[in-house]
A protein has these predicted regions:
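Substrate/ligand-engaging "lid" and interaction regions
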Residues: 59, 79-179
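Small-residue-rich helix-loop
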Residues: 172, 176-222
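Conserved N-terminal Rossmann-fold NAD(P) cofactor-binding segment
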Residues: 1-15
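Short coil/loop linkers at secondary-structure junctions
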Residues: 67, 121-123, 193
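N-terminal Rossmann-like NAD(P) cofactor-binding module of classical short-chain dehydrogenase/reductase
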Residues: 18-19
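Conserved beta-strand termini and adjacent loop/short-helix elements that scaffold enzyme active sites
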Residues: 9, 75, 127-129, 197
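Rossmann-like NAD(P)(H) cofactor-binding subdomain of soluble oxidoreductases
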Residues: 24-86
Length: 224
């Protein structure tokens, strides 16, 4: 689809169906900017929500004086894999399948899915609770620790560094697997059965690998 309008002023582009695709660190700022235009029939999807992003977003709207909250949902991860290929260009390498989505209010989910554009709907799979989408947040495993372990490479502008393919070596993969094990254990204790990151990679990208390291290495979308 063609982009109808782009603007740095949120007032110019806000609609009744909003997909927030910023990092979670920007969610509160987006909520504050959206607050003057929010209404009870609006749909807001945090793509991704990360960990309980829907709750955080709703609380920020309330702080801004919003009384009747819109329909708010969160996804476990962003629906596409992309990289910035130049200052003004982004390349999408893959669209993820069965991205889990849940609503702050269970009654909102059917409304949200019915209003979702047909071009996006096939990529999302509804879940009953944002507890599931939050614990199923694979970004907490794939992003945080590898960034700390590769901060030197990341800050070196002259290095041709590919975050997943170069940054997640065998030792890094072994470390984040332990984080993933703990994530799944905490989720299970809270009543949620979630898949491992390795299983998520197999399901989402169709990769083959005996462990997390091999699944990352065999993911063509991570080689760019």
């Amino acid at each position: 689809a063609k982009v109808e309008k782009a603007s740095s002023n949120i007032k110019d582009v806000v609609s009744d169906f909003v997909m927030v695709t910023t990092p979670s660190s920007a969610h509160k700022d987006v909520a504050r900017q959206l607050a003057p235009y929010v209404h009870k029939d609006m749909i807001i999807i945090l793509n991704p929500g990360r960990t309980f992003g829907a709750i955080d977003f709703a609380n920020e709207l309330k702080k801004c004086g919003v009384i009747e909250l819109p329909h708010i949902a969160e996804t476990q991860t962003i629906v596409y894999t992309c990289r910035r290929s130049s200052d003004n260009q982004t390349t999408i390498f893959a669209l993820k399948t069965d991205v889990k989505i849940a609503a702050l209010k269970k009654s909102s989910l059917e409304i949200i899915m019915s209003k979702m554009p047909d071009c996006l709907k096939p990529y999302f799979k509804p879940e009953n609770s944002i507890g599931y989408t939050s614990f199923a947040n694979v970004g907490m495993v794939l992003h945080c620790s590898p960034v700390l372990m590769n901060i030197g490479w990341i800050e070196s502008e002259k290095v041709d560094f590919k975050y997943y393919y170069d940054g997640i070596s065998k030792s890094v993969a072994t470390f984040i697997q332990k984080i993933d094990d703990e994530r799944m254990a905490v989720a299970k204790a809270a009543g949620y059965e979630i898949e491992s990151v390795a299983d998520w990679l197999r399901r989402t990208y169709g990769v083959v690998g005996k462990d997390l390291y091999e699944c990352i290495r065999n993911n063509g979308a991570y080689k760019e």
